[in-house]
């Protein structure tokens, strides 16, 4: 991981286990990036600018996103994005927030928020498909407890924080599309 990215995350990450096997490790930013409040519909993380670097993910072995796309073993950056309100994503989730997963080796500037198209292009390098790798996320109301929980029939979520902002992130699950 490039020092400019690693220096911004919390020292203690989170390990997601399946039994005793580590399937994912996550480190979120110590302080959340800030910007003008986003007033678009169905956005929960309104104070974090689109395309901002929010954390690091490491997959020690092959994993997958909620769409079933394969994620190769490796280290990735996480950046916040919002799926476009063009009708292609109806029923995916009540909120439009998600983390775009991109190869850490190809992400160049932790301090620059990426526009939608360059961000999607960067993630396509990881997915090898026309669709970026994504992890669904939303702001949690109140303080909430940190840790893993079951959400509905198919999803396992992580309750954590980016800086002081409480979030819920789907770390395992499947969306039937």
Residue ranges of model-derived segments:
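N-terminal post-signal-peptidase region of extra-cytosolic proteins
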Residues: 39-44, 53-62
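A short tyrosine-centered beta-strand micro-motif
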Residues: 74-81
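Short active-site loop/helix that positions an aromatic residue
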Residues: 84
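Short, acidic, Ser/Thr-enriched surface-loop or helix-capping motifs
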Residues: 65
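Primarily secretory-pathway and cell-envelope proteins
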Residues: 1-45, 101-177
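Short consensus segments that form the blades of beta-propeller domains
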Residues: 47, 88-91
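Extracytoplasmic
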Residues: 21, 50-54, 71-73, 94-96
